Each structure stands twice: as C-alpha cells, then as structure tokens.
Amino acid sequence: MQGRRELGGEPLSDLQEEAASASLRVAPERLSDDSLEWRRTCPDLLLSDGKASISMPREGGSTCTARCPDPGEHSSTWGEFEGFRESSAKSGQFSQSLELLEGPTEPQPPRTTSAPKECSSHQPCQGGPWVTGTSAVPPSEPILSYENILKCAFQEITVQQAAEDVSTIDHFLEISSEEKPGVERVHKLCNESRKLWRALQSIHTTSTSQRLWSESRCQENFFLVLGIDAAQKNLSGGQGHIMEDCDLKEPEGLLTVSSFCLQHCKALIQTKLSGPPGSKQGRLMTCSRFLKTPSCGGGQHITIPRKRMFTPRKLKLTLFNSDVC
C-alpha cells in the first residue's frame, strides 16, 4: 500500500516515459541466422526519493533482478509489453553487423614479399643483374613526351619547294601562244585591244589613238562594252561643244596633252559626235582620251559631262577581258 501511494505521487505520463526508455540488451550467446532474441531488462525502482530509477544490467546476467515486478502486474500503470521477433533475413544481417562491431579485431598476418613472381621481359627475376641485396630495382623505362609521340605518329616528309611561275597579264599580252607553246591560253586576246592599249601608253597618244579608232573594226562593240551607245546620244553641231544647248567648252589644257602617266591619274574616254544640224542620228567620227587632273585652286577635279571615267587597271581589264573583236 505504501508503494502504491508513493507511485501514485508521480504522474502516469512520467512513469510511462521512464518505462519506455528501458534498455534492450541482445544476448550474443543466443544469436543465430534464423532468429534474434531480445530480452528486456527490468528496471529497479528506488522508492526512497519518490522517483523511479533504472539500473544498468550486469556483465554476465541477461535476466531481470529479483525486485523486477511481473509484466502482468500493475497493468493499469505500466501497460502490457509483448515480446517481438524479426524476420530471419533482417536478423542475419543484424547479427553479422554485431559480430563485426563486437568481435575482437584479429591482427592480420604481415604480408611477405618473398612470394614467387613470374619473370617477364620487362621485369627481371630475382638474382638478375638489377638485384642488389634483398630488393630488386626495376629497369629504367623510357621517358615519353608529347613531342616524341607526335613525331612518331606524324612523320616529317620533305617537300621540294619549287618557285611559283605566276604569269601576269602583261606576260600574256606581250607573249603570244605561238612564241611560247608551253603556255596554254584560256582566252584568245584581241589584236585590236592590244594595239589600242599600247597606243594609250605610247608618247604620241593623241594622233595614234585617233588613227587606231578610225581604223578599228570593233568600235561599236567596244563602246557597247563600255556602256556607251552612240545611237542614243544627242548630236552636237561643233566638235568643241559637248551638247547643242550647252556652252561648256572643253579645257584647252586637256586637248593639248600629248601623254600622261597611268600611275598618277585616271583616264577618260569621250565620244565626240558630229552630224548635220537637222539629223537625229549621227555617225561616230573620232574618239579621244583625256585626263582627269586636279584644278589649280581648291584641289577639285575637272569634270566634263558625257565622259565615262575608268581607272587604268579597270580600263585594261575591260579591254582584254571583253571579246570586242
């Protein structure tokens, strides 16, 4: 009765928490692969201070102490505890882990280096020329670098360097296919274009160019290549005028120029048309070449209407790349 009163002084929740925290001890002598038996240790309740205390189990004993009450007793206070068993697979895994943790660590025997090994071509046997005492020194392996690997993979091939024989446009203009049979021409150059280009570079260009244009049989085709259509031009009454209703005179300095340098100036090709006053269409009389030079003041260029401007290189390519003959 006194024990019940002292137990009644403690709340039921505290007693249930202390009872639930009772430790479970595994009996290692009864572990097997099929089953794992758990035993519940019985707490010793010390009623002197009015609190329940749990005594730890002894080393050799796995059973409850003499003061441990029966599980069926005080069922209303402690509740009923039932034993449980786990499956054989889980218990086997758990027993193996416990054996590894609780079992003493046995020292492994030291490994001996006196085990016989097979001899190979790269590693000599014991007693070979590299053996000094009890330890064998491995042979020195060749040190491989990326440079050696690339040299072995991609071997160098000596190529004979030949001088490039690049023929310029002047070479094709001056030398014909008959003079050099080894050179095969893709496009046969026009003789009239060659004569005209040489005349433009000569000293007496004014008289020579007028004579060449008057004697040429490809004037109309060449003008069409340059974008000059003589049939659609407005006729001019005088040779000095460019158009009938225009009073602009051609500069006298340009008419008197006999030669010019192709490297420092640009060439102009001008068609001069003349015909009867009432006629709508005239015939092409002469064709002259003029310069485009900077004026004395302001650094501006003199521009003349009805004249198409070509650079020397463009004029040369237009002459020889177009089939005007």
UniProtKB/Swiss-Prot annotation:
It comes from Homo sapiens (Human). InterPro entries: Aftin-like (IPR046359), Clathrin-bd (IPR029205). The gene is CLBA1. Coiled coil: none annotated. GO terms for biological process: intracellular transport. GO terms for molecular function: clathrin binding. GO terms for cellular component: AP-1 adaptor complex; trans-Golgi network membrane. Pfam families: Clathrin_bdg (PF15045). This is Uncharacterized protein CLBA1. Residues 1-32, 51-79, 92-133 are annotated as: Disordered. The lineage of its organism: Eukaryota, Metazoa, Chordata, Craniata, Vertebrata.
